[in-house]
Amino acid sequence: MSSKRDYYEVLGVSKDATDDQIKSAFRKKAMQYHPDRNKEPDAEEKFKEVNQAYEVLSDPDKRANYDRFGHEGVDGQFGGGAGFDPFDIFNQFFGGGRGGGAHFEQSFGGSGFEDIFSNFFGGGRRGASSQQREANLVVSIVLTFVESVVGVKKTIEYKIEKDCESCHGSGADNSEGSISTCSNCNGSGVEITQKRTIMGIIQSQNICSRCNGEGKEIHKKCNSCKGRKVHEERVEIDVEIPGGVSNDEHLKVSGKGSVVGGKTGDLYINIQIKPSKIFSRKGNDIYVILKVDPILAIVGGEANIPTPFGIKSIKMKPGTRNGEIITVPSHGVKSTKRFGSNGDLFAVVEYTSAKRFSSAELKSLSKFAQETNDEIEKYLKEARKEIN
């Protein structure tokens, strides 16, 4: 990007936006442009731009300077300098995951990834930290609503990267002189720049522009991997998805990521849940429509309620009303939190159209229809008051 955009425009908020509105906008934009989710060529640049905007607008002092002086008032103030690490901000923002489920070291709620990306990028220089970023993988799977509630075993197929065996992950040919210490940063991976602003001279630490923070320069690429340092490999694993997961939750499977720089990364499974035509979820509670014949509702009897665990038969009391809610305890979503409570299932009674009756049956029913209904009489009494 040739010039910096207005930070409020970047996050899509107004200049009088509240802290909560800024946080909400950042969450949405950061997830949209994260390079491990968005493969567009400019995704990483947009991700950095979003994080820069949030670092300024979420800090009262920086925001005040920005509102007064524009970009010049905050340039060089980013944590780590102009070459600041946007993933540090991302990780600080998306914290607070919860303890895991079966076969998973850790799971993370839809509100954030916690340490999914904390290992992806380090601050200042790349080197081992960028290797860790490449080693960790995110794979999305789709579950039905019922699978998300009761749990399911899934086979996941995905690609990993492994260190090139020829160059051992260096990307350089094995011949002498094919790789050397970076002449620009002397192997540190960073370079120091100074910028004069209206607030004085600000010194910044940036990722080395020559070696991109690696500290090494490759003069002759490896013939096997063509300088990529890794080879791709397709793998397949079976995982037990625990019951109770939420949409956009992330489950961590340790040691199932790529192998880069001699380090094995982790696999993060992104859960996507298909909407149900029968059930809806609020927290750990499940809601379902209970179709009931009006005659059965009047006289009472057995009714069948769909639950994620199967059809459950219940005894309906006589005079059950349309819209009445019947609670089925412990048939909701199982809590995956240590001190959380399991949910219940709430069945909302919905009358169906009455079935067809024979002439004899209608004659018998008509006797009951002619009897006085107190609710109707009360309604008509109120109506007569308004009419007269």
UniProtKB/Swiss-Prot annotation:
Residues binding Zn(2+) 1, per UniProt: 164, 167, 222, 225
GO biological process: one example: DNA replication
Protein origin, superkingdom: Bacteria
CXXCXGXG motif repeat spans: 164-171, 182-189, 208-215, 222-229
Subcellular location per the Swiss-Prot or TrEMBL entry: Cytoplasm
Zinc finger (CR-type): 151-234
GO cellular component, one term: cytoplasm
Primary localization class, coarse: cytoplasm
Record-annotated J domain positions: 6-70
Gene Ontology molecular function, alphabetical: ATP binding; heat shock protein binding; unfolded protein binding; zinc ion binding
Residues annotated to bind Zn(2+) 2: 182, 185, 208, 211
Cofactor annotation comment: Binds 2 Zn(2+) ions per monomer.
InterPro entries assigned to the protein according to its UniProt record, in alphabetical order: DnaJ (IPR012724), DnaJ_C (IPR002939), DnaJ_domain (IPR001623), DnaJ_domain_CS (IPR018253), HSP40/DnaJ_pept-bd (IPR008971), HSP_DnaJ_Cys-rich_dom (IPR001305), HSP_DnaJ_Cys-rich_dom_sf (IPR036410), J_dom_sf (IPR036869)
Keyword annotations: Chaperone, Cytoplasm, DNA replication, Metal-binding, Repeat, Stress response, Zinc, Zinc-finger
Cofactor requirement: Zn(2+)
Function: Participates actively in the response to hyperosmotic and heat shock by preventing the aggregation of stress-denatured proteins and by disaggregating proteins, also in an autonomous, DnaK-independent fashion. Unfolded proteins bind initially to DnaJ; upon interaction with the DnaJ-bound protein, DnaK hydrolyzes its bound ATP, resulting in the formation of a stable complex. GrpE releases ADP from DnaK; ATP binding to DnaK triggers the release of the substrate protein, thus completing the reaction cycle.
Subunit text: Homodimer.
Entry's family note: Belongs to the DnaJ family.
Domain writeup: The J domain is necessary and sufficient to stimulate DnaK ATPase activity. Zinc center 1 plays an important role in the autonomous, DnaK-independent chaperone activity of DnaJ. Zinc center 2 is essential for interaction with DnaK and for DnaJ activity.
Name of this chain's protein: Chaperone protein DnaJ
